[in-house]
Amino acid sequence: MTSKAVVFAYHDIGCTGIEALLNAGYEIAAVFTHADDPRENTFYASVARLCAERGIPLHAPEDVNHPLWLERIRQLRPDFLFSFYYRRLLGAELLACAARGAYNLHGSLLPRYRGRAPANWVLVNGETQTGVTLHRMIERADAGPILAQQAVAIDPEDTALSLHGKLRKAAGALLRDSLPLLALGVLPEVEQDESQASHFGRRTPADGLLDWHRPARQLYDLVRAVTQPYPGAFCQVGEQKLIVWSAEVVAGNHGREPGSVLSCDPLRIACGEDSLVLRFGQRGERGLYLAGTQLATELGLVEGARLRGAASGPQRRTRVLILGVNGFIGNHLSERLLRDGRYEVHGMDIGSDAIERLKADPHFHFVEGDIGIHSEWLEYHVKKCDVVLPLVAIATPIEYTRNPLRVFELDFEENLRIVRYCVKYGKRVVFPSTSEVYGMCQDPDFDEDRSNLVVGPINKQRWIYSVSKQLLDRVIWAYGQQGLRFTLFRPFNWMGPRLDRLDSARIGSSRAITQLILHLVEGTPIRLVDGGAQKRCFTDVDDGIEALARIIDNRDGRCDGQIVNIGNPDNEASIRQLGEELLRQFEAHPLRAQFPPFAGFREVESRSFYGDGYQDVAHRKPSIDNARRLLDWQPTIELRETIGKTLDFFLHEALREREAQA
């Protein structure tokens, strides 16, 4: 019986995959591809032309996961879906359309080099072997079980183009051998080893910048990874751009400074280790393809001249503006960025008690102020800095019902002004969305790109925080379509030292664990709202801040235009369970004798605790596939450890308060 397939394909390897399916006797019901981008150098074969010649129905929708296309694909009743170098992720509903599964051909030996442009990345990293992998598709990109692999040797002279040719040939051989077995159902699957996984994002022309302080071998690998038909490696010669198409490594650099011209015939440049001969290149985007010696003449180079590239002088630190720098996330993040050594932090807040320890750092600049008042300072620093984090917000549930208009004014209106400054000055914004935007979503795991955002009726004012954040998420997304660089991150119940203050808990304006600790410290009953059955996934602040720091670092631009949940799905617990573990650790703490006896648990109704207009959520569990894929991040700290650190901090704070009042 003939197997029916729907194919998603682009590039040479898309053509290779289609030919292999036809040769293996598959019926191709339809092919989905991309319209060629006029800005891209399309050196590869055309899937559209192949399908036209073979009489195969062809489509190029903007969104293949759209319900209209999903229904059309379901009506085709495919046995298999295949993806051959298709550039968009296929969603879970689409993958489920295939009766016998969905399969992807990836251009590396998975689990290594997941993600984009693997052929370029393996060359940049100096690998000696890569290959192709046929694997089952799951929701997470390039992570499904492996069915077949074929290795490809990388020769020292290989470029991205020659390696692509090798991969195309290997793909043809792999599919020739595997597709008949897959149709028979006798091709075994092997789960990927996640401990060996690596992920790489898209490359841009800017990634070709030559840093002469690096070893010549690394620069040679960069040149061959991005040479024609790609944009090329480059550096600056005065005001002119020098694009390097071919190079070779020569031992030694005569002890000269990186970037120094050692000779003009051949054109030889000193590197951090050894030197690089520039064999062929061109001057500027429209220049002629020339030999290195003629390039030296055209550019006016002489022995001893210096070429400019990355890190040609002291590297300027990335300037990060943190508004709300004294808050829980702000102060922990500032500490992490300053420790990294690559950042300069500028911050504003209405207080500074949590950041006193940072003020002595010469790369930390703090101004006490209010974002609603100090608009000139705010606009100037958005213009001055590279990355902006507007962390100022009211984020405690009791305030949503007690001061809903203030929540809207601060969380939406004031932050919208900051976002518009980022648009005006072309600055990247990393915006704190919230797990609250998912509201009463019924999905078992909340997915950034697929889960519905569900809130209650208008008379339940607690949702004003959720919808204020959601509306700003949507505004930022819309600005992103016009060129704003952004990342939205959604924290899921981060906990740790300096989360709140006990004074805040005394007036009810704090997070759950601070409220529970206050009851233990003061010897009052722990109040469990509606019995404390609500479940949350608690995340250690150190885990959360590490993920956020990676978003700010934004390696290879992979976080641009993305939404990222930052939470720990393994640390799910009810509020009652949180209280019970807190009590257990409190009773065992060395400072236990300094505090009153435990007064028990008391169940209270949410209305009596939060007031009218409150509505709770039974569970809130994140999918962290985006964080794993984009950040190579996985939370590691168990809830018990986080509770212990948080409890210890607040018990010592309580004793300091007592001493101050004595």
Swiss-Prot record:
Its EC number is 2.1.2.13, 1.1.1.305. The keyword Transport does not apply. The record marks 104 as: Transition state stabilizer. Keywords: Antibiotic resistance, Lipid A biosynthesis, Lipid biosynthesis, Lipid metabolism, Lipopolysaccharide biosynthesis, Multifunctional enzyme, NAD, Oxidoreductase, Transferase. Pathway: Nucleotide-sugar biosynthesis; UDP-4-deoxy-4-formamido-beta-L-arabinose biosynthesis; UDP-4-deoxy-4-formamido-beta-L-arabinose from UDP-alpha-D-glucuronate: step 1/3; Nucleotide-sugar biosynthesis; UDP-4-deoxy-4-formamido-beta-L-arabinose biosynthesis; UDP-4-deoxy-4-formamido-beta-L-arabinose from UDP-alpha-D-glucuronate: step 3/3; Bacterial outer membrane biogenesis; lipopolysaccharide biosynthesis. (6R)-10-formyltetrahydrofolate binds at residues 116, 138-142. GO terms for biological process: lipid A biosynthetic process; lipopolysaccharide biosynthetic process; response to antibiotic. One of its GO terms (cellular component) is membrane. UDP-alpha-D-glucuronate binds at residues 395, 400, 434-435, 462, 493, 527-536, 614. In the N-terminal section; belongs to the Fmt family. UDP-L-Ara4N formyltransferase subfamily. Bifunctional enzyme that catalyzes the oxidative decarboxylation of UDP-glucuronic acid (UDP-GlcUA) to UDP-4-keto-arabinose (UDP-Ara4O) and the addition of a formyl group to UDP-4-amino-4-deoxy-L-arabinose (UDP-L-Ara4N) to form UDP-L-4-formamido-arabinose (UDP-L-Ara4FN). The modified arabinose is attached to lipid A and is required for resistance to polymyxin and cationic antimicrobial peptides. This is Bifunctional polymyxin resistance protein ArnA. It comes from Pseudomonas aeruginosa (strain UCBPP-PA14). The gene is arnA.
